[in-house]
């Protein structure tokens, strides 16, 4: 369950069997459609029985356990329907590439970077496509690399290792409350709830373990030069005192002036179309104001 030995004597076992034992057999893995979700507990293995001087490549892939689609009902997983068509296998080579048996056996072989998604449009080398509400199992493949005169050549099929304790159900939200609490207990960044029932506010390392931190949604206002008094409305509407618009033009940059003193706001240049429209409006108001000669008003109204 926690280790497997091939006929050739290669042994693959879990690096942290005590953690997987707490989750099995009700392990659930949340899947996302954006950047993928890191598998937790992590897939860390200990490999023994390799030829210390020979070269090996190590791969991992996920495969469906059966042809059944499940549903969570009355606190347990039950068969629901015939499974969706099985997807092609996606082999992911360990990023260390080809290494000697001695190197592989010297420390745990970790696939903690592998993520899962149910979005077929994601083409990331670290992401494996899975199917929601289906049971999957990780498979480790060890291939010996042989040296020929023409170069290096991997064994065609290699040896595969499936550890039953790593089986998991793919879900879009945790169904089992006990399992959800285990995730939170072992992974401080896991999606879950606090004891008071409120949603955790910290980021989820399962979602993007090595991704850069998300930017705050709060936008810092730009620094405004003190000698510039910006209007609170758009240039077309801000003048309410029938003052000639030419008096306000120096406040704004021209369309060609990219060194405007208001940082990050070089786009605040008047569009000449609206400038002309505003001038026309101002002239109209001036001619309609009380005290203007009647002949000017008549002349304007006749236009």
Curated annotation (Swiss-Prot):
What is one cellular component GO term in this UniProt entry?
chromatin
- Location in or out of the cell: Nucleus
Provide the residue span(s) of the region labelled Disordered.
193-225
Annotated GO MF terms: DNA-binding transcription factor activity, RNA polymerase II-specific; RNA polymerase II cis-regulatory region sequence-specific DNA binding
SMART domains the record matches: TBOX
Gene Ontology biological-process annotations: cell fate specification; nematode pharynx development; positive regulation of DNA-templated transcription; regulation of transcription by RNA polymerase II
Q: Which UniProt keywords apply?
A: DNA-binding, Nucleus, Transcription, Transcription regulation
PROSITE patterns recorded for this chain? Answer: TBOX_1, TBOX_2, TBOX_3
The biased composition feature labelled Low complexity covers: 204-213
- Role according to the record: Transcription factor. Required for mesodermal induction, acting redundantly with transcription factor tbx-37. Together with tbx-37, acts by inducing cell fates in the AB lineage, thereby playing a role in development of the anterior pharynx.
What is this protein identified as? T-box protein 38
GN (gene name): tbx-38
């Amino acid at each position: 369950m926690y280790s497997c030995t091939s006929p050739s004597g290669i042994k693959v076992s879990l690096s942290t069997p005590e953690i997987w034992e707490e989750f099995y057999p009700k392990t659930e893995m949340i899947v996302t459609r954006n950047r993928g979700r890191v598998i937790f507990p992590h897939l860390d293995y200990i490999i023994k029985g390799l030829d210390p001087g020979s070269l090996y490549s190590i791969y991992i892939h996920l495969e469906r356990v059966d042809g059944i689609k499940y549903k969570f009902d009355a606190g347990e997983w039950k068969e629901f329907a015939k499974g969706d068509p099985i997807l092609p296998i996606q082999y992911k080579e360990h990023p260390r590439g080809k290494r000697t048996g001695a190197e592989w056996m010297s420390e745990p072989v970790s696939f903690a970077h592998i993520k899962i998604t149910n979005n077929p449009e994601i083409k990331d080398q670290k992401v494996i496509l899975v199917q929601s509400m289906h049971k999957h199992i990780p498979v480790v493949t060890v291939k010996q690399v042989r040296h020929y005169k023409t170069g290096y050549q991997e064994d065609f099929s290699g040896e595969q290792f499936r550890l039953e304790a790593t089986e998991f159900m793919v879900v879009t939200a945790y169904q089992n409350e006990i399992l959800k609490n285990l995730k939170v207990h072992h992974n401080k960044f896991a999606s879950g709830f606090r004891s008071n029932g409120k949603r955790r506010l910290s980021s989820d390392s399962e979602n993007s373990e090595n991704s850069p931190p998300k930017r705050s949604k709060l936008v810092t206002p730009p620094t405004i030069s003190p000698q510039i008094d910006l209007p609170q409305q758009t240039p077309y509407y801000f003048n309410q005192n029938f003052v000639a618009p030419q008096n306000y033009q120096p406040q704004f940059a021209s369309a060609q002036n990219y060194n405007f003193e208001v940082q990050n706001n070089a786009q605040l240049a008047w569009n000449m179309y609206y400038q002309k429209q505003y001038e026309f409006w101002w002239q109209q108001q001036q001619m309609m104001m009380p005290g203007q000669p009647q002949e000017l008003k008549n002349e304007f109204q006749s236009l």
